[in-house]
Amino acid sequence: MPTQMEVEYWRRRYQRMNYERFAAANVIALITHAATQPLDMVRIRSQMLQEGKTFSGLGYQKGWYPFQIMEEIYAAGGGLRKFYSAFDTFFFRTVGYTTARVTAFGYFYDKVNKDPRRVARPDFLVAAGVLGGFIAGVVTNPIDIVYNRMQVDELYPQAARRNYSNTVQGLAKVAEEGALFRGAGANGFKLAAICSSMTNIYDWCKENSYFFFGPHWINRLWGTAVAVAIGTVVSMPFDMIRTRLHTMRPLPNGQMPYNGMFDCFNKIIKYECNSKWMSNFGSFYAGGEAYFLRLFLICYLSQFLVDYYNENYYDQEFWQPQRFHYQSGIDYDIHDPYTDAFNKKLVATYTTAAGGMGAAHPSGKDNLAII
């Protein structure tokens, strides 16, 4: 008869991408990205309106507030469909990004975490996030260029618009320019920053708040908020650079405004972040409110969808291996195959629920009560 630890090992031994994870991850991504796509449109248009201008203050982009941009997009006609540019490109971008990110991260995570019953060390988790995120960003760069250009096309005069009608035409036009991997480095670093920064912070926040609040919904809420805030801070400068490189056009002299990621970074610092013009580093965070809110909603909603998928009934980390002992701190040598959520579920079911361990009570009828 195998022990519970052996059962857990064999049940969790495969940590890479498989058909089940492919289907679950992409369905969840399509739901959450579809619900938050209008915020992505606001984010990228805020970044385009910031180009070439100084940034004074924090929390607004030279007077272009996120909700004002959203209202103007909607008022321009086309209804909600306008926020999605082209449904086929939105679909391919979401599925491609999700598949590449989960596949790459799972591959490297499997390499650094040999025991699937435990969570990898924080530094190993960061390494897997950096490698997996960077590769995913580079691989999905062509479809990102097409989609980003579609999102900002209406900001240009009619004669200067690219007018991509679908994904295939957009990819063909970008390939003619020889720009399929323009900005791929910045795109890779953006995803690397997101994947490597948020998981560890989220775990740390939840583990420490559990000591004070117990199994409460506030743990998930504030842990997600803190992780997304840090993820926004470290990833958005790369996102700004990526947007500039993806959407740039030749200047009147025939030259491109940016010669690469580092040149773009230096020019933003020199012309848009210069303190002589009452500006600051906030130029890299134009559209930051929409960026943060979208990322938060995606992360927070995804957790509940994963709960539903696993039939956990919103018990947090119901079957995830426990790695935190609340009385003694983190200890990777002690392993309990059951989580606190599962143990509490057992207590609630078999000691207080009707028909649980009533037979063990002296009367044979009353249930045991936890005092």
From Swiss-Prot:
Solcar repeats lie at residues 16-111, 120-208, 215-304. It is a multi-pass membrane protein. It comes from the Eukaryota. GO terms for cellular component: membrane. It is found in: Membrane. The chain crosses the membrane at residues 22-42, 89-109, 126-146, 184-204, 221-241, 281-301. Pfam families: Mito_carr (PF00153). Keywords: Membrane, Repeat, Transmembrane, Transmembrane helix, Transport. Belongs to the mitochondrial carrier (TC 2.A.29) family. This is Macronuclear solute carrier homolog CR-MSC. It comes from Oxytricha trifallax.
